[in-house]
């Protein structure tokens, strides 16, 4: 019961959640991958999962915002040396596109091409771009904070996991493809998470409930942060995002 009584947060520092330019680049990259997949393979799978996951994740971002589950600061784009604040709903859409459409599209696209060296070079070029984008940033002001073990989120995560395993059981011909997509997403997310943690842009907070039912902030150690971020990578990204495959591909 300690896991339920205590409060665990993922904290984002820096301007990652507020940098609209980078999010737009990721959106464009996802669209280009989908176009290439359609032209060369006559497949709309990437388009389907990109559009579907973006819509759903934008709704999730909106719910996180209005319920104060995630504290979100204003998002900006820089154009012609001007800093322009984006309307909140455009910000939520771009956040939803990156969190949903970008990750699922990249996961599916490169998961299908793990045995092709040319595509792996492109994949790792993307990863290098992401790393450079991380290590060249220095702003460590807190930008968002998300409570990951609310009763609602744990129930949803449990239902999503059951649903995905049910779909895998009923559609065994898709197991290998889903496994490759899972591997691709977890690999990408692990590298991104490591470098954002290393630079101080991503960390965790833990609040323990004492005998008086009051929350006391714990001094977190590396193991605490590792386990919380690992949960985010494996469950909230790897397993949860397979839901979009099952909804829009099968």
Residue ranges and their predicted role:
Residues 1-250:
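Aromatic-rich, lipid-facing transmembrane alpha helices and their immediate juxtamembrane interface loops
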